Amino acid sequence: MAIRSFRPYTPGTRTRVVTDFSEVTGRKPERSLVVSKHRRKGRNNRGVITCRHRGGGHKRQYRVVDFRRNKHGVPAKVAAIHYDPHRNARLALLFYTDGEKRYILAPAGVTVGQTVISGPDAPIEDGNAMPLSSVPLGSSVHCVELYAGRGGQMVRTAGASAQVMAKEGDYVALKLPSTEVRLVRRECYATLGEVGNSEIRNTSLGKAGRRRWLGRRPQVRGSVMNPCDHPHGGGEGRAPIGRSGPVTPWGKPALGLKTRKRNKPSNKFVLRKRRKTSKRSRGGRDS
């Protein structure tokens, strides 16, 4: 997989950088694993906007992804690598020996024709799923369960991986992509290797229209709104915000405010908090 840039023959292609999709082998998704999905466009059940800047975009069909990997001891062959419009990672289509078909997140380096398997006795190879108790120290894993049997909930984005740091008692210490070190039960499953399509962080949309295709609407600055719409609004011309720091449309501090509850029960499983990162250091398709 590589990235592709374009000659500046239009303003939209001058800064456009995309992945070349060379690893994608399947043209159409598996019909038995595709379901329709109602797009809420940032609204809740009452029609009230709860997430701004959402709406429009190209129609999508949801691919049912197997995050549990609960077919233990049954080998599966990678039949194809498919594109998924709902995530940056690619999907690997698995054909199990008993005839069942499933999608999983495509790990980096896994190719068509390769065999993967899940279970406590699975070999140490990328793409195989096993309990954290069976993963060697220092190994990279992704699609990690927080609770046994619930399915992978952490480390699922393109290019992400967590590192197994230590094992003690019933818990395994994982270093997450955010640099946070967290304890997870040793019976929780994880997939070896990192998620593929890591080059997505080096891409650039190039124009506003491509962002609209993804279902992202324009973000209007609060300083150009009226005072009834945003605390930064109002004034004559380009007026300052008139506060000690920027705030959200609801008047709460916008930058650096901790949103995690201080007395959250799972705080005892966090051995080391993540380091602070700036917005400029974050990459990805939406940058």
UniProtKB/Swiss-Prot annotation:
Belongs to the universal ribosomal protein uL2 family. Gene3D superfamilies: 2.30.30.30, Nucleic acid-binding proteins, Ribosomal protein L2, domain 3. Residues 221-287 are annotated as: Disordered. One of the primary rRNA binding proteins. Required for association of the 30S and 50S subunits to form the 70S ribosome, for tRNA binding and peptide bond formation. It has been suggested to have peptidyltransferase activity; this is somewhat controversial. Makes several contacts with the 16S rRNA in the 70S ribosome. Residues 258-287 have a biased composition (Basic residues). It comes from the Bacteria. InterPro entries: NA-bd_OB-fold (IPR012340), Rib_uL2_dom2 (IPR014722), Ribosomal_uL2 (IPR002171), Ribosomal_uL2_bac/org-type (IPR005880), Ribosomal_uL2_C (IPR022669), Ribosomal_uL2_CS (IPR022671), Ribosomal_uL2_dom3 (IPR014726), Ribosomal_uL2_RNA-bd_dom (IPR022666). Signal peptide: none annotated. Keywords: Ribonucleoprotein, Ribosomal protein, RNA-binding, rRNA-binding. PANTHER family: LARGE RIBOSOMAL SUBUNIT PROTEIN UL2M, RIBOSOMAL PROTEIN L2. One of its GO terms (cellular component) is large ribosomal subunit. Transmembrane segments: none annotated. Part of the 50S ribosomal subunit. Forms a bridge to the 30S subunit in the 70S ribosome. GO terms for biological process: translation. GO terms for molecular function: rRNA binding; structural constituent of ribosome; transferase activity. SMART domains: Ribosomal_L2, Ribosomal_L2_C. The keyword rRNA-binding applies. HAMAP family: Ribosomal_uL2_B. It comes from Synechococcus sp. (strain WH7803). It holds the Pfam family Ribosomal_L2. This is Large ribosomal subunit protein uL2.
